[in-house]
Amino acid sequence: MKKFIAQMAMAALLATPVLSIAQESQPSLPYREVSAQAEDSHKVVVFFSFACPVCASYDQTFSRWAKTLPPGWSAEFLPVAVPDKGNYIAARAFFAVQDADPSRLAAFMSAAYTLIQQNGMTMEDPGTWSRAVAMADVQGFNEAWHNVTQQRLERAFAKLLTYGVDATPSMVISGKYVITPDDVSGDSALYMNLANGMISKVMQER
């Protein structure tokens, strides 16, 4: 599984005491429990990277699964906005599409994965994103791109640190439980069953 937190990210984590730092749960459990974040209590936050081949393999699965969540729940896809050029450009492009033409976001993500994972394009290359936008027929991208603020990217990075995410993909269930495919030895069907089970667990706890 792709590990992506660089030394800079870990240094930021250690130097930021105001953030809720993930606390390890029992090693035998297929999830990690962290300090609960109330704003995400009815969400599944999906952390991903376009550079991650495992994320690419889950792209369509996540998209379909997000539509099956219980009433009152939502899925939030969040790119790993680690402060390096490639990840920042990728995150900015994602947010721009999300703002400009949200109905085309899933198509944009699939196009970006294809260009990066299959065609060998890079996240640092602006041409990757202009091509993905064209493939997905996104409208209004350029204006939205200029309106994505540095603060928004920093908030995405802060959430990454809050949940102690160190692998992609990772799902955070109800702002409390973090799960990755590694927790189920990479079994994709079991991973999605685990996600459903964690949502059921949360609903029973309320």
Give, region by region, the residue ranges found by the protein language model.
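Structural microenvironment flanking redox-active thiols in thiol-disulfide oxidoreductases
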Residues: 71-94, 105-132
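Short N-terminal signal/transit or membrane-insertion segments
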Residues: 23-32, 94-114
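Sec/Tat-exported extracytoplasmic proteins
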Residues: 51, 66-69, 97-101, 112, ...
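Second-shell loop/turn segments in exported
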Residues: 49-51, 79-84, 98-99, 114-120, ...
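Soluble non-cytosolic domains of exported or imported proteins
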Residues: 53-56, 84-88, 99-103, 123, ...
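Extracytoplasmic thiol/disulfide redox context detector
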Residues: 2-85, 149-151, 157, 161-162, ...
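C-terminal cap of thioredoxin/glutaredoxin-like
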Residues: 135-206
